[in-house]
Amino acid sequence: MLPMAILPNGDRWCHGCRQRYLRSRFPIFSVDGSRTLPTCPYKWPNGQGDVAKFLQGIENRDLWEKEHGQIYRIWSGMKSEVVLTQPSHLQAVFRDSNKHSKAENNNSGYLMSELLGQCVGLVSRERWRTLRAVTEIPFQHDKMPSYLELIQRHTRHHFDRLLASGDLRQERIHPAQDLKMLPFWVVAEIFYGECDAEMKTELQQLCVLREDLFKRMIQGGIVRWQWSKYLPTATNRALAEFQRRWRAFNQRAYDRACQQQRILPIVLMIEAAREGSTSVEQIYQTIDEALFANLDVTTGGISWNLVFFAAHSDIQERVRQEVLSATDHDAYLLSSSTLLAACISESARLKPLAAFTVPQSAPTDRIIGGYNIPAGTNLVVDTYALNIRNGFWGADSQCYRPDRFLEHRATELRYQYWRFGFGPRQCMGRYVADLVIRTLLAHLVAHYELGWVEPDPGKNSTWQRDLESWITIPDLQLRCVQRRND
């Protein structure tokens, strides 16, 4: 007798069974019980995650919202995720975000668990509070003045190298590729102190290994399942090599700091783990999150600013004059009320780092958009709907106008704008990220003039992005001419 899956219409039968099973396992009804929540069809094996949600999220979010409305459901693997698109949805959900739980392994499965499943960004409740207390100290707001010299030094040296051996010699710059490693080395020095040549070589090699593993994780499939760890695959071999070398690197960095009698974050974190407040693996994965996982994140945050400056020479010149007229340069870089800071916020508004946020769940039932969402249901935010399609931003919401951020107080933007998250679980590295971006852009506009290689840049929605990256980053070159007074 032939298996059902290879009988005529067998695939359709299996598909229908999966749909019915998932809807019965994760039932969501309207408040009056007359309707079920609109839901994207489950597609074996990944559902709408992670390729459809991240790599293709910008295009898919439009299609899904048009088909299903302002609140609907997608599947990440076989996990239910409810998509929120309106500020009113966020008000109902995030009022107690400190009590929320992040989705286990980001709903991405086994390989993600081995890379980041225990990092501070993905654990919840008491585990999160304990780990955050151990790891957040070097990233607190009051530490930023002490990093100014470090960040400015790395910025100068990075541009010197680009001028000596990069395309900058030909007055060209690729914002993502050419600036990718600058924030990486800044964060590495915060954790480990100034890295010697051997440490830099090992970190660069680990970057390549880690990037390949993350790309494989995004593709999903077999690496979602726990049993895949027993298979003799290239992915498992690469994972074992990365974990072995990453643990060894951090142990050597710890030993080096102890020998030098330096109280660096790597020392404080590992000693906290050895005292039992957290685990060494949680520390390693949290450093991984800050260095490797956030490599693309910070690259995206930096690089779109250059593209917008190239397309808007008037704004670029205004920022340049602001930079040159600052009487206290350090205070200027630390300020959040400058045109420079507004430009960074506006770039992040128009080019959110990802189309959907990391899934998390509320501890109690919520009524959202006329539906009763049970406690523990994973929720994600459509960042384009919030940052661009939101009526709060006015008729010019799709236009680049940084001054809009000088017209609103920060409290007015709550639930209207997504960048680093919401509430106490906002990104731990947000202050360092902002300081790196401000320093880089201030250096750039003071010493270089950005322009478009092509005569007509077109609309920002048509600018080429890297289609292989889970983060929205540009894939294009700009004209970058050193100013004559330099």
Curated annotation (Swiss-Prot):
Keywords assigned by UniProt, alphabetized: Heme, Iron, Metal-binding, Monooxygenase, Oxidoreductase
Binding site for heme: 427
EC nos: 1.-.-.-
Source domain of life: Eukaryota
Keyword Methyltransferase found: no
Pathway given in the UniProt record: Mycotoxin biosynthesis
UniProt function note: Cytochrome P450 monooxygenase; part of the gene cluster that mediates the biosynthesis of aspirochlorine (or antibiotic A30641), an unusual halogenated spiro compound with distinctive antifungal properties due to selective inhibition of protein biosynthesis, and which is also active against bacteria, viruses, and murine tumor cells. The non-ribosomal peptide synthetase (NRPS) aclP is responsible the formation of the diketopiperazine (DKP) core from the condensation of 2 phenylalanine residues.
The protein's name in its UniProt record: Cytochrome P450 monooxygenase aclC
Organism this protein belongs to: Aspergillus oryzae (strain ATCC 42149 / RIB 40)
